[in-house]
Amino acid sequence: MDKLKKVLSGQDTEDRSGLSEVVEASSLSWSTRIKGFIACFAIGILCSLLGTVLLWVPRKGLHLFAVFYTFGNIASIGSTIFLMGPVKQLKRMFEPTRLIATIMVLLCFALTLCSAFWWHNKGLALIFCILQSLALTWYSLSFIPFARDAVKKCFAVCLA
């Protein structure tokens, strides 16, 4: 069906390079992409929840929490690669409108792990996990048109 759409829209050319044939042959079907997205997102949610439960394990709880919670959030973001593809996802992550949000998310990932493994500070790890969640929310809102503007206005009204 996609090939028919390309031919009808004039996008299909007869001179196809070997690379374009490899890319087309290795691309996933839409149903496989949806299944991959759901599986990766579910793994991310489960890891985050497991990390929250493991926080209360004596001695190693903080390390387990930081690893599972951060890995869960990375898996949740990574799940969208199935929908968009890796190159398009990376391009969209670093667009000017969401560059700061992307940097904050990546920084919070790193700081959460640093506070657990190098600094051994539970309070700081929890703060960075909260910031991680807020940064991910802000990053996610950047994909919904005018959502961040609406959130800003709501907070401005609430604080005024």
From Swiss-Prot:
The keyword Acyltransferase does not apply. GO terms for biological process: protein transport; vesicle-mediated transport. It is a multi-pass membrane protein. Residues 1-36, 85-98, 145-160 are cytoplasmic. The chain crosses the membrane at residues 37-57, 64-84, 99-119, 124-144. Keywords: Acetylation, Membrane, Phosphoprotein, Protein transport, Transmembrane, Transmembrane helix, Transport. Residues 58-63, 120-123 are lumenal. Pfam families: Got1. The modification N-acetylmethionine is found at M1. GO terms for cellular component: cytoplasm; endomembrane system; extracellular exosome; intracellular membrane-bounded organelle; membrane. It is found in: Membrane. Its main location: membrane. The modification Phosphoserine is found at S9. Belongs to the SFT2 family. May be involved in fusion of retrograde transport vesicles derived from an endocytic compartment with the Golgi complex. This is Vesicle transport protein SFT2B. The lineage of its organism: Eukaryota, Metazoa, Chordata, Craniata, Vertebrata. The gene is SFT2D2.
